[in-house]
Amino acid sequence: MDEKKKIEELVKTLNEASEAYYNGQDEIMSNYEWDGMFDELTRLEEKTGYILPESPTQNAGFEESNGEREAHEYPALSLAKTKRISDLQVWAGERPVWLSWKLDGLTLVVTYDNGKLVKILTRGNGTVGSNITFMKDAIEGIPKTVKYKGHLVVRGEAAITYTDFELINDTIEDDDEKYANPRNLASGTLGLDKSNLDKVKERHIHFYAFTLVHLDETMSSWGERMDYLEKLGFTTVAHELTDAKGLEEVVERWTKKVENGEMDIPVDGLVICYEDNDYAQTGSVTGHHASRAGYAFKWQDVSAETTLKYVEWSCAASTISPVAVFEPVALEGTTVSRASLCNISEMERLGIGEDGKTTLDIIKANKIIPKCIGVKKKEGTFTIPEFCPVCHARTEIRISEH
């Protein structure tokens, strides 16, 4: 395929996946697949110099909201990312850096004047966001007033815990209507209108501050800025001071917390930023990234091959859903033998076959949830049950509206 056509195809596919991911719809690809396609697009753009304006490499994100569109006072740019600790060490150089979680929610920017909350904007495309100030009483963790009389701008992540996510999904009877993950639910919730504020409040979306964007007074220490936010009443993202020499140990230790299931707040990586906030502001802007604002680290997805034994059809409410049951395989410190296949469309996309010889490629998404990302070798075809395995009623295929 011509490289320019390949770029156009990748942009279209990635944008469709991003729109589904950010706007409360069903996921159409895994983070693992998205990252791989994004990296391929980046390489092709660098090689050819052919960059479409709508390319995801040029945009911070996708979202829909019922709020009025409004320009950001300070652009909310995305961060460059890597999967190599060595890149973080080079970026840190000889300077102390702070490591924190990369929370998997929706970025918001909150503004205060004379001690009062005056604005809540979503990140949008990084330049223009949606004004959702009308949700100020429904989002937890955003103080209505602060003990500061100047102009204050704070950036943070609005997220839903796994505990609340599971409780909310349990109230949805139709499996096809359930949310794919907490990020998906948070984004869909913040896209609701003023008539649904009670529903927003019931979902316990919490704001976690990760950057003090503007303060009238000079405060050059990133750590002091975070301490100040805590004094003002914000919940800040967890953070730890380190340097290039200590980064590997800190990253490994924090990663273990995710692998051991200690995190109730969804995360999809780590972030480092300079302790010297003044130095961080001196970087250039390349593409849609501020070169010294921070550096994101995403975990390498460790995959393992295994053989599919059979597909089990799991019943919940009025829906039966496919689950891959495969030969046990060691992955990320645990042994896994089952993974959801979501629905019939996903089985068809993957190319699932059921004759005991189909080879699957399995990962643990975000180091937690087993997920089938591909079929290495397909043997046979799969069979859709004619009758429910529980109540024995005749089955029918339904197409989700989403």
Predicted region positions:
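Short, conserved beta-turn/loop elements at beta-strand boundaries and strand-helix junctions
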Residues: G115, W313-A317, K377-E379
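A short beta-strand motif that forms part of the nucleic acid-binding face
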Residues: D113-N114, T122-N125, V325-P328, N343, ...
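Short nucleic-acid-contacting surface segments enriched for D/E, G, S/T with interspersed K/R
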Residues: S345-L360
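Long, charge-dense accessory insertions within large macromolecular proteins
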Residues: S86-Q89, E157, Y162-E348, P370-K371, ...
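Hydrophobic beta-strand signal
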Residues: C273, T358-I363
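Phosphate/adenylate-binding "loop-and-lid" substructures adjacent to NTP/NAD/dNTP-binding pockets
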Residues: M1-V146, N184, V258, I265-V267, ...
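Long, non-coiled-coil amphipathic alpha-helical linker/lever segments
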Residues: Y148-A159
